[in-house]
Every structure is written in C-alpha cells, then in structure tokens.
C-alpha cells in the first residue's frame, strides 16, 4: 500500500509555494539556460549515427578487372581483413580502378579506424604492382552517402583541362581543408597532361617499337637531386634542364638515330596538350563541366560544414578568371533547414492547440496562463540539457518536443484541476494549493516515472536504429522530467497567487455554455458507466477482443523500415549494353539528359560517364537530378521518378534506375535502387550459374519492381593467346607482350612533369583513329633478341571472349548485388518475404550464401526486435508501477489499457495507407506511456477513496471515474492535439513525421473511448480476484 504525504502540508511542493520569489528566479534560470542552449545547438537532419567508414581507391589505368582484383584488391583485402573492429568490407574492381569500402563498428572512433587503415596500406605496399602510378588513397567518407553540395564549373573561353587545373589547385584543395569535409571529387576527368599518340605504321617502318619510345621519354624527363658545390667562400646548388614542360618540347625529343639522322618524337607521334584520361566526361545540364562533389566525413555536422563552404566560396571564386563560372547546383542543407523549420512551426502549432484546449476546459484566463507558462518552460529548459549531451536540433528531437507538448501539459493540468476543485469548494487559494499539490504529488510522480520507463527500452535498441532514437528518447524523457519539476514547483505556486474563487466563478456566455455541455457529457458518461459496471463480463470480452484484434492487425499491416523522404534530389544510374564504348555512352547520356531536363519538376542535372572509382564501367553513367523546391512543383519525388522513368523508356538501348536521396544512409555502395540483396560465393563460376536463375525468378514477383543486378559478365574481351614456344625462340617474354599492349592501349602514364603548383603526366598510347577495333592489334610490334621487329600476330592469336566488367567482393569473397524497389501497393515486408520464399524454391548449394544489405538488413533487424522492444517497455512499466503502488495487481489493471491504443494506432495507419515502420513503432511505444495515464488517475483516486472515506470498491471507482473524467479528457485531447500537427504535416520532411502523428492520434481516440469503461470493470474484477485469493490463503492457514 502506498504512503501519500499529508495533504495539508503540500508535500514536496510546500517549500516552493511558500517562497514565490525563489521559485520564480529558479524558473527564470531554467528559461535562460534553455535559450542559451538553443542558440548553441547545431542543426542537422537526423542524429549523427553514421558508421565509421573509410574508402580506399587505387587507380591502375589500363588494367582489366581480373588484374585489378588479383594484383591490387586482393592484397589490400588480406591486410584490411586483419583489422579489429571491422564490421564489413566490400570492394569493386573494374577496368583501371579498385575501390574498397571499410565499414567499422559504431563504437570504434573514426580516427582509430584511420590509423589502422594506414597501417594496413603500408603493410600491403610491397605486394602491389611496382608500376602503380600512385599508391592507394583513402578517404574518411561513405561512398553511398550523397554529396552535401554539388558545384558545376564551366567556361566558355577556356578548355576544360585548364579549368580543372585551376579548380583543383585553387578551390578543391581549400574546400578539402574545411572541418567536416571528407572528400572532394572532381568528375569530368579533364586533368591536364601531355598525350603522345604513336603512329604504329611510322614506328614500324623505322624498325622501332613503342617500348623504345617509352624508354626514351622516361629517360629524357627526370627530376632528381644533383647535389651542390661547397667552396671556401661560397656554396653553389646544381641544376639542369632535365625537365620538359610542354608538348612542343616533347615533339623535339630525339628518340633514336637512323643512318646518322635523328628521329624526333614528333616524326612518329602526335604530341598535344590534352586530358590525362580521355574516357571521362561530366556535364551540368547540357554543358560540359567539371562537377565538384563535396562529401562529409561520417559523423560531421552537415549544416556547419555546408555553411563553412558557402562562406569560403566567394573568396575562392574571386581567384578564378571571369570566364570561369562556379554554380551551386545542389545543397542538401536547403531541404534540411526547410524540414527543421517546418517541424519547429508544427511544435509552435502544437503548443498553441494545447493552450487552446486548456482554455476550453478551464474557461478561465489565469488558469490557462499557468500551463501556458509551464509548457514552453519545460520544452525550452530541455535545450540546456541537450547541449550537455552533445545533441542537435534535428527532425527527431523536434518531433520528441512536439509530442512532449501533450505530455508536459498533463502534469500541469492535473495539478491545476485538483487545486481549482478545492478553491471552488471555498478554501483559500494558498490552502487549496498546499492541499491539492500534496494530494496529487504521488500521482505526478507515478505518471512521470511510468512514462519514462516506457522510453528506457529505446535506449537499448541495437545497432544504428538504437543510435538513431537515443536522442529522441532522452530528449522526450528530459522534457517530461522538467515538466514534473515545474508542475510540483511553479504550477502550485502560481495557482496560489493567481487563482481565486472570484476568478474561477466568474463566467461569461461561453463558459456557461461549455459548463453545461461538460455537465451533460459527464452525466451521460456516468449513466453509461453504471450500465457497463452491471455487465462486467461483456466489457471484459470487449477488452480481450481488442487484444486479439491488435495481434491480428500487427500480423497483417504492411511493414516498412523508414519513410521515403522527399529531399528534392534524385540519384540515377544509366545502363547501356555491356559492350558500349565511352563515346557511345556519352551520346546516350546526352539523349537521356535532354529528356529529363524537359520535366517541369527538374531544376538541374549533373551527369558523369567513365571509370574513375565512382563509376564501375564504361556502359554506365551516374546522374544527379536536382528538383525544384517543394512549393514550386506539383508532385512529390516518387511521382516525379515514375514520370521520368516513363519518359526515358522511349530512349532506345538504355535502362534508367532512379532513387530519391535519403538523410539516413546505411549502405556502403551506390546502388541502383533503394534496397539490396546479395549472393555470395566462393567463385565467380558459381555466381554465373545462379545469378541469372534468381534474377529470372525475382523479376516475375509482383512485390518487386526495377529489379537489376550488378552482375555483368558479357563484356567483350580480346584474348591474346601467345604461343610461348615461338615467343621464347625469338627472345620475347610475356612481360614484353604486356608492355607493348599497355603502351598502345592503356593510356599509360609513363612520366611526370613537376611544376611549382602541381604535377602532370605524360600519357602514351597508339593513335587508333585509322585502325579502330581489333584491327589495331595488328599494328603491335615487339623487339626480338637479335634486335629485329616482330609483329604480334606472328606469335599470338586473338580470340574474342566474354568477361565481367567488374568484380565485386564482400568480405573477400565474390558477390553480386541485386537491387530492387517496392511497388506502391506492396510493403518492404512483403518484398523481403517474397525474396526469402523464392530463394527456398531454388535450393541453392551450400557454397552460395544470401543476405540482405543496407536498409533492408536494418529493417529485418528492427522488425525482429520490435516485439521484444514493446514487451520490454510493458515489463519496465509494470516494474515501476508495482514499486510505486506496492502491488502486483494494480499495475495489471493500468496496463490493461494498452491493447486499445495498439488497435487504434494500427487501424489509423492502415486507413491512412501508411506502413508500420520504425517511426510508427516509436509512436506505439509512446502510446503505451500515454494511455495508462487515464488508469493511473482513476485508480489513484479510487484507492484514496477506499482508504480515507471507507467507500466500497465499486463506489470508489465509480466516483473516481466521474471526478477524473474532465482531467482525463483534457490530458488526452492535449496529447492528441500535440500529435495532430505531425499527422497533418505537408511540408519538407513530412514523410518522416506523419506516421508518428497518425499512429498517436488513432491510438488516443480509440483508447480514450474504450478505457473510460474497461478500466473500472477490470479494476473491480481484479479486486474480486484479490479478495478470493486472500480468503483461500486464510482457509489454508486455518486448516493448517
């Protein structure tokens, strides 16, 4: 049995009621601390929950995917695989590029992970090819995380090579130095270089080979130490003209002598200033450009990082020529700010609605002012605690405060209503405040700690979802705690000073009409309650049916992971036939760009073609479509995507895959669509057998759309089958063959030009304009042991074959990723189940393993823990209530209200067409804390009436229900109106907020109607059970 403080003393509130000045100053201190905290808090879209992620890129121009895999990726993977704290390692080896993405455990600091990566790269250095142009480069960035800012650099007067050179040295480097920036990439590939295009016929006629030319260039351009002269009186540094800086100097280079006459490089090659890689290109809208993508470090604050870039840009662009134009095409922070602003507006709207409902019930301005002060004070004070906890102002913390509006006002309402009741009975305001606050103090404590108990399981959610909602749960808990403090200190003090019999009795036409309305409602409720109490078993059956119905709804409701947000940016992947060349792909890309830019919702477009570590193959292109602001377009992002895909379907020979960018990025690779499923095997042959079979099955499933795979094994290969015996007789080694082919077709970087500001490359290749395709192989010549020139065709046959365009690994084993979207009439849960069922029908061998990735894997994990999360919340609340009430039975009575909330929430979600996602589940957990307030207020007063007035249990619960009907209705409507702005949200980020509001409004409506009748019935049934149990024990003791 609980022990209440004497009602005459005021309990813990007495000190604050009797010392109004001290109480006022204490509240002013909380207010000032909150205001200062608000100004100091950073702003972000969501809490920072990124996995520590590092990307390692190695470029080896001319190398095939299998060479990149065996010579570069595999040695690095073996070293990385030994690092502690590594969660997942994925890699992609394509023509000339190896990209390894390392994702670490959430608990590992990024700086520690960086040190381990650097050590592993150092250990693998001796295992990598000796002719790598550059060592592996790592960046603290998640490649799947969309850039925080995209800039396009264009010029109508300067070549792109000069533009990129200036942008790289004057702009990109400076932006890279900004705190929070993880990587700045320049897409477009127009880095300056001297290109040497050999005329195969010319060097063959002179008896030379490409290797002769390469050796001559390499030896003629050096930059090394030469020493100095140190005499008796002065020192002299040695220097020489060992560097060649321009294409003209290289043209004059003598590569050999024949019959005493020099042969210059210009005689056998076209030497020109050009781009280091001619198979790269980027466009902004329809104009060729250098596209600068800025990505943040995992964990960096996106708003402050973007603000720093914006502040620096004017200074950086001033250093560029006037003909060079820098345009910000996308800035993710624009939508983040808009989303946060909309959420703040909804918070203010919730406060206004709650104050309005208070006035409607209390019909008294002084009585309305008191909770009108308590609510913002509790919310503002929360900001001070958020600063100390390193939180940010984001959508989730603002949602927590919006929901808290309905929570925090409850405490003030309960206190005011109880004090007002004593004043209306004729007691002085001070005595009424002491008596009312002392009487209600235990109820406030019960409400507060039982509600916080519901939030405790959220803090123990695992992985990234737990990190995501940690700020939400703690922010809400802090607001509730501050509210309890304010309600037990400031609220009764203000009641003692502001309320009086005259003010409470003073009525106008509105107050008289509303009073009569409430009296009629209470009278009707009393009549209905009396009838219900006469039919307890029928009422109990209704309560049990809600439990059964909630289970059924839980089973059948569509389930998802996280709402798809409209952030105004669409990422796209364009794919053409596997044999497509760079020129062919660039042409197709421009056709698609023309179609996309015609859409009225599209503001700008950037696209990129080529292989440079971000794009895996020549037959694919990356696109970023920037939409107009939400208030300037008619359709949401999903409708725009559907419209664009329909339009692009008319372009022959290409497939376009689109997905909206999201604030929450869990994946470690850029995917074609939203969700991923992987097949992993011990060999590529196993994948080549089973991937097509599974793809065929999945493409037939109605639960999936846009099904695609990164498995591309039909890339054209010209296999050079060398007769080793013939080659050996001529003194030609396989290294000679590889060198000759690399010199001709690999855009080989053979020398470096050093300047004061940068370094540039000399690129060697054959001029294949007159001998396109496989015919170019007939021009290859090698040097035999006797100095003669031997055609490649004399020792080798060319065989056409197929090979993968890229080779992907997951944790060092071959893997392919199947990407898919979910149609509008299905949920992610439906899609996951359909894939699992299809997998079972294939009877995959034991060496093939499957796994969902990214958000789909997180969905499975969250779904699996949801039931346990709700059970944990219920158990935690039972324990807290049991301790507070010193009873095993009363907590069960209180918890019997929960199924009604679940039924209401699930029905509302289904009617609204929303999925049961993580946000909606959080709403249901919060409902568990809200709806039990009704039962607590009823049971507290019923127990007090039984103990102090000697009422029977039936009379006590009946009177408690009538007495507490108005505050119950008031607090429920306050919580409902606090969630209503979220449910009706239409602005930026509304997709994230709406499921929480829908679930809470639906749950509150249904639970309010049902629990007013089921709770008193269950209270009486458990009272009978307790009496029966006691009598049984008593008989046993007598018999003993």
Curated annotation (Swiss-Prot):
Assigned protein family: Belongs to the resistance-nodulation-cell division (RND) (TC 2.A.6) family. MdtB subfamily.
Listed transmembrane segments: 16-36, 347-367, 369-389, 396-416, 440-460, 472-492, 537-557, 863-883, 888-908, 911-931, 968-988, 998-1018
Induction comment from the UniProt entry of this chain: The mdtABC operon is transcriptionally activated by BaeR.
Domain of life of the source: Bacteria
InterPro entries recorded: AcrB_DN_DC_subdom, Acrflvin-R, Multidrug-R_MdtB
Tagged with keyword Transmembrane helix: yes
Primary role: The MdtABC tripartite complex confers resistance against novobiocin and deoxycholate.
Gene name for this UniProt entry: mdtB
Protein name in UniProt: Multidrug resistance protein MdtB
């Amino acid at each position: 049995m609980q022990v209440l403080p004497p009602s005459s003393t005021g309990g813990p509130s007495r000190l604050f009621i009797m010392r109004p000045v001290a109480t006022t100053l204490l509240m002013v201190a909380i207010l000032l601390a909150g205001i200062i905290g608000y100004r100091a808090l950073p702003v972000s879209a969501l809490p920072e929950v990124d996995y520590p992620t590092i990307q390692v890129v190695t470029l080896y121009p001319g190398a095939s995917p299998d060479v990149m895999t065996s010579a570069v990726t595999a040695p690095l993977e073996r070293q990385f695989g030994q690092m502690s704290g590594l969660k997942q390692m994925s890699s992609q080896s394509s023509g000339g590029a190896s990209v390894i993405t390392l994702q670490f455990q959430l608990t590992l600091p990024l700086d520690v992970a960086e040190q381990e990566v650097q050590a592993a790269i150092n250990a693998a250095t001796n295992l990598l090819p000796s002719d790598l142009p550059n060592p592996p480069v790592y960046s603290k960035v998640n490649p799947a995380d969309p850039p925080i800012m995209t800039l396009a650099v264009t010029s109508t007067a300067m070549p792109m090579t000069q533009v990129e050179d200036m942008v790289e040295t004057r702009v990109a480097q400076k932006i890279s130095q900004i705190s929070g920036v993880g990587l700045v990439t320049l897409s477009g590939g127009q880095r300056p270089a001297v290109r040497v295009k050999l005329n195969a016929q010319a060097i063959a006629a002179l008896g030379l080979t490409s290797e002769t030319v390469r050796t001559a260039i390499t030896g003629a351009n050096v930059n090394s130490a030469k020493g100095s002269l140190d005499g008796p009186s002065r020192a002299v540094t040695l220097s020489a003209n060992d560097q060649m800086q321009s294409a003209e100097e290289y043209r004059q280079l003598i590569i050999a002598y024949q019959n005493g006459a020099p042969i210059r490089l210009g005689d056998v090659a076209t030497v020109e200033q050009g781009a280091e890689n001619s198979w790269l290109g980027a466009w902004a809208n329809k104009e060729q450009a250098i596209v600068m993508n800025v990505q943040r470090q995992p964990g960096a604050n996106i708003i402050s990082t973007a603000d720093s870039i914006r502040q620096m840009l004017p200074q950086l662009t001033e250093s560029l020529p006037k003909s060079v134009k820098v345009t910000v095409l996308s800035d993710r922070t624009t939508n983040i700010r808009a989303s946060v602003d909309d959420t703040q507006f909804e918070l203010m709207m919730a406060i206004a609605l709650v104050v309005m409902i208070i006035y409607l019930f209390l019909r008294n301005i002084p009585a309305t002012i008191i909770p009108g002060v308590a609510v913002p004070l509790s919310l503002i004070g929360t900001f001070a605690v958020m600063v100390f906890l390193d939180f940010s102002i984001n959508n989730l913390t603002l949602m927590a405060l919006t929901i808290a509006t309905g929570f925090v006002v409850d405490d003030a309402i309960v206190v005011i209503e109880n004090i007002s009741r004593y004043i209306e009975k004729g007691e002085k305001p001070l005595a009424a405040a002491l008596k009312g606050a002392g009487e209600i103090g235990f109820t406030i404590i019960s409400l507060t700690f039982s509600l916080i108990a519901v939030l405790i399981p959220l803090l123990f959610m695992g992985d990234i979802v737990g990190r995501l909602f940690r700020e939400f749960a703690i922010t809400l808990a802090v607001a509730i705690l501050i509210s309890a403090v304010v309600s037990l200190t400031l609220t009764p003090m203000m009641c003692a000073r502001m309320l009086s019999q005259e003010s409470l009795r003073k009525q106008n036409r509105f107050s008289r009409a509303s009073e009569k309305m409430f009296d009629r409602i209470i009278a009707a409720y009393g009549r209905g309650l009396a009838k219900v109490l006469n039919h307890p078993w029928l009422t109990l059956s209704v309560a049990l049916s809600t439990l059964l119905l909630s289970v059924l709804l839980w089973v059948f409701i569509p389930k998802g992971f996280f709402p798809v947000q409209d952030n105004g940016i669409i990422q796209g992947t364009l794919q053409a036939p596997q044999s497509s060349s760079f020129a062919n792909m660039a042409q197709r890309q421009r056709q698609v760009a023309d179609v996309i830019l015609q859409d009225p919702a599209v503001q700008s477009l950037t696209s990129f073609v080529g292989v440079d570590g971000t794009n895996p193959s020549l037959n694919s292109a990356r696109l970023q479509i920037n939409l107009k602001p939400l208030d300037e377009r008619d359709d949401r992002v999903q409708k725009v995507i559907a419209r664009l895909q329909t339009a692009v379907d008319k372009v022959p020979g290409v497939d376009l895959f689109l997905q909206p960018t999201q604030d929450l990025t869990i994946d470690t690779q850029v995917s074609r669509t939203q969700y991923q499923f992987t097949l992993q095997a011990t060999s590529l042959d196993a994948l080549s057998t089973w991937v097509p079979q599974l793809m065929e099955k999945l493409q037939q499933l109605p639960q999936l759309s846009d099904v695609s795979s990164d498995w591309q094994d039909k890339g054209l290969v010209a296999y050079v089958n060398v007769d080793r015996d013939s080659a050996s007789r001529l003194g030609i080694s396989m290294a000679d063959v590889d060198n000759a082919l690399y010199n001709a077709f690999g855009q080989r970087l053979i020398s470096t030009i050093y300047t004061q500001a940068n370094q540039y490359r000399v690129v060697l290749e054959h001029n294949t304009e007159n001998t396109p395709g496989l015919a170019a192989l007939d021009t290859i010549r090698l040097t035999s042991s006797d100095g003669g020139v031997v055609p490649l065709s004399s020792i080798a046959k060319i065989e056409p074959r197929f090979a993968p365009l890229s080779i992907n690994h997951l944790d060092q084993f071959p893997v392919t990723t199947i990407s898919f979207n979910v149609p509008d009439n299905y949920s992610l849960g439906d899609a996951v189940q359909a894939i699992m069922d299809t997998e079972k029908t294939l009877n995959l061998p034991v060496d093939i393993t499957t796994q969902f990735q990214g958000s789909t894997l997180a969905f499975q994990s969250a779904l699996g823990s949801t039931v346990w999360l709700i059970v944990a919340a219920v158990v935690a609340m039972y324990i807290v209530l049991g301790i507070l009430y010193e009873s095993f039975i009363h907590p069960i009575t209180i918890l019997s209200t929960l199924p009604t909330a679940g039924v209401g929430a699930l029905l509302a979600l289904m009617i609204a067409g929303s999925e049961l996602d993580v946000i909606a589940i959080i709403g249901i957990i919060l409902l568990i804390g809200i709806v039990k307030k009704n039962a607590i207020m009823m049971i507290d007063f019923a127990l007090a009436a039984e103990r102090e007035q000697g009422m029977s249990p039936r009379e006590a619960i009946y009177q408690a229900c009538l007495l507490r009907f108005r505050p119950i209705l008031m607090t429920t409507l306050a919580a409902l109106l606090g969630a209503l702005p979220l449910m009706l949200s239409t602005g930026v980020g509304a997709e994230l907020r709406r499921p929480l509001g829908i679930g809470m409004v639906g749950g509150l409506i249904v639970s309010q109607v049902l629990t007013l009748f089921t709770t008193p019935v269950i209270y009486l049934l458990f009272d009978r059970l307790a009496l029966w149990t006691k009598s049984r024990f008593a008989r046993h003791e007598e018999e003993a």
